[in-house]
Amino acid sequence: FGVDFSYMSRVFNRATYVEQQSILCDIARHNFPILGLDHAEVINDDSTAVLDTLGRVSMIFLDPARRDDHGSRTYAIADCMPDVLTLKDMLLAKAPTVMVKLSPMLDWHKTVADFAGAVHEVHIVSTGNECKELLLVLGRGRCVSPLVVCANDEQVLSYKAGDNSDNHTTISDSALAARNTCNTEDSLSEESANDFDSSHWKYLYEPNASIMKAGCFDVLEQRFAVHHISPNSHLFVAAEPIADFPGRSFAIESIATMNKKELKQLLAGLT
């Protein structure tokens, strides 16, 4: 317990951990000194009560409880405790930066809209290609185009929401240098998708879980030499291999329709 706090608190001179369950506070008080967090204070109280008496701080991190009084899991922000939407103005009055950890099940577009311009950054975090967390960074001043960061292990893609200009898009990968290729051609039309030219398109690409959650498919087309198969698809094709594509890649060897006879011939010999 308090893992997020233990990592973030290391970059601050003072840190305060607030938890309303006494047993979790006891665990934190035991663990923090062992982890070298002698500057961390543990308070067993309701976070809203502590917020009322809190002075000015550099940053506030909240991980709202996602279970109701009956122990059932909740997803909507208003159903979590505390309700960050209600406390937004007070939080930002106390700290210029507020980070909120939310369920990856949330519609992040609606969530950003609900905060009415207070969201400056959206971090969609995945590991092993499984979306784990949605992190919002709130700030003072109205933001109309928050930075969206899609992270899946070493793969990180960032862009400005509402602005598809490649000047606001960066790709980074710990193993590969950032690509400088920019492709602005339109997605494959419905007609060309139905009459797929396998002699030209040799590779199939599926974005990772964070990008799928973000839905930033136009950004992929702008940043990489890939073409969206269809507006209703999440798959892309390319004529050349792209080593640093943020997702899975496949070499296209054969193409068939869903005709049973054709599929049987194509898959003959496969086990």
Put a short name on every predicted segment.
Residues 1-271:
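SAM-dependent transferase fold signal centered on methyltransferase-like domains
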